[in-house]
Amino acid sequence: MTPIHYPETRRGDVVDTLFGEKIADPYRWLENDVRSDPEVAAWVERENKATRGYLDMLPQRARFAQRIRALMDYERFGIPTKAGRRYFYTRNTGLQNQAQLFVREGLHGKPRLLIDPNAWARDAATALDAWKPSDDGKYLLYSVQDGGSDWRILRVLDVAGGKPLADEIRWAKFTDLAWVGDEGFLYSRFPEPGAGETFQARNYDQAVYFHRLGTPQTDDQLVYATPDHPERGHGATVTQDGRLAVITSSTGTDARYELHTIDLSRRSRDGWKARPLVSGFEHDWKLVDGMGQQLWFVTNWQAPRYRLVAIDLGARNPEWRELVRQSDETLQQGTIIGSQLVLQYLKDASSQALVFGLDGRTARAISLNGIGTAAGFAGKPGDPETFYAFTSFNRPQTIYRMNLASGESEPFASPKLSFDPREYDIDQRFYASKDGTHVPMFIVRKKSIAAAGKPVPTLLYGYGGFDIALTPGFSAIRMAWLEAGGAFALANLRGGGEYGRAWHDAGRLANKQNVFDDFIAAGEFLIAGGITPRGGLAIQGGSNGGLLVGAVVNQRPDLFAAANAQVGVMDMLRFDRFTAGRYWVDDYGYPDREKDFRILRAYSPYHNIRPGTDYPAILVTTADTDDRVVPGHSFKYAAALQAAPLGLRPRLIRIETRAGHGSGKPTDKAIEEGADILAFLAQWTGLKVE
């Protein structure tokens, strides 16, 4: 192997003293915003040029780009939403950079284009994010995302004429969209950032506002805020019948909430008076819906794997009552449709859906198509139908329409594929981690490879954090890897939400090392089980999963042939200094508290690189407008990797422009990025594209 000559990166002399330990941070200057710091911008340009030169020489890149493009080229639909007689849904013909939004007058009406984000920006990096029609379908409230940023602009469309109203809301972020009749809506926003701080300033003082249609944002009414606790976040939802608004407050990313209610029928007398419902930030409360003054919630209060409870606020002495008790599976969420409840569960990281009466009595299970992920089941009281989606590793999303009276489902929108899903095998294995805990893992490969028992280059993916469950889903990029003869493995690590609160708690704060041990054990299992050869294992993870990749590469560099750390949290001593990073203390701890500092210092990827050790080939990927995990994390980590003597394998960084943490990325950019990553991983695991 010929050594790679990396661009030169200036080393600064920054040294912090934290709890008696001197911590060098020579690349602190790379935290500066690429838009305002010419030195950082020049560094990004040099690094991208070097990485581009390497990736373009890889013999399999063009073939991967061709196959990913072909695999993405199928018509796909979003789950329809009904409002009045109108049905709203998104559709992408295949290779459009952004999905379009359509409406039908009645289920079988002619589709009419309402919103085409592809016309918004020449580089297609402005995307339609969330959207919600008013209850009667007269208006459509939608949010616009630019350049991948978490900031949103809210706008309103008159559906009948297809014309936008003059209303425009700025500085919305992490917001629900909640109509109050058709007079206006509730939303959450932050104060406008200072000059030059749009993509880096810490997010404090989120508040809920009411916007009345036809008025300027400056006239919006403050609904709920906690100025004495600027660290708290607040969101608002409105029950389907419009009677109650529910304010959900949090202190971080952990699902421990306080709840307040606002009786919208008394607004002329009480204004936005919020009455406390749940206090203490101790448990998760997911609103199912409400009728009149009765509310239904999915909660882990006295039920680590969740149960369904209800309360009647109109009763003389309102009390919580249990409708559906905790089961062996993890209850994820619920909806009320017609006169029934649909509850969605996870069983070993795969979806189940059950229909109950409003009194909690079981009616029937919804038949899903094997191992996979279901989503949707939305609707209103009185609706005769609901729509849901189902997907798996080998099956792109199919939309189903379910008749609530008969319980029968029929396809509403099915993709036409350029591959045969039946050629692929999905297997779920359970392996023992370092401490003996059994951890589930999905393994996907061609049936012919599985039958032959042949070890092949394998891409192992993980996350392990923030109570987020990884479930089966289709990816054209992963399918291109499988088509080429590789295997894909998804490990359901501790720290995730696959098995309720205990599983999450076992992978956060002082238990974070369990996540890394689980991932390392997954790699060892794949090698020992003959799934992949030694020297054929690649790993990948994004965001918290990027941290995972960086940590395990430091701890076991010998185990992996290649690694792709995507938009990762790499400096665990400064993550809370930027944008939403301060929320993550629920999972990571506080860097300015000694006990937490010692834990973070021990695994922080940026601070634990091991000079003189042979490292795997590493491709770090990030984007210049990522204001969730700011790109400075990846910039500093890549600079430190390139400066250290870590062997001859490449350690490169790919920095996307006009993109963020992942959502809203144009199809063309996703294809190019996917081809770069697969070609890099294939080069160092020995995967040969057929």
Could you describe each region identified by the protein language model?
Residues 38-133, 143, 232-290, 322, ...:
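Non-catalytic accessory segments flanking enzyme active sites
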Residues 92-99, 121-125, 144-153, 168-173, ...:
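A flexible loop/linker signature enriched in serine peptidases of the S9 family
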Residues 103-104, 155-159, 202-214, 259-265, ...:
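Beta-propeller blade signature
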Residues 484, 490-690:
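Active-site-proximal cap/loop segments of hydrolase catalytic domains
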Residues 226-306, 311-319, 324-329, 334, ...:
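Long hydrophobic segments that form regular secondary structure
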Residues 117, 159-171, 215-227, 265-278, ...:
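Blade-edge beta-strand/turn elements of extracellular beta-propeller
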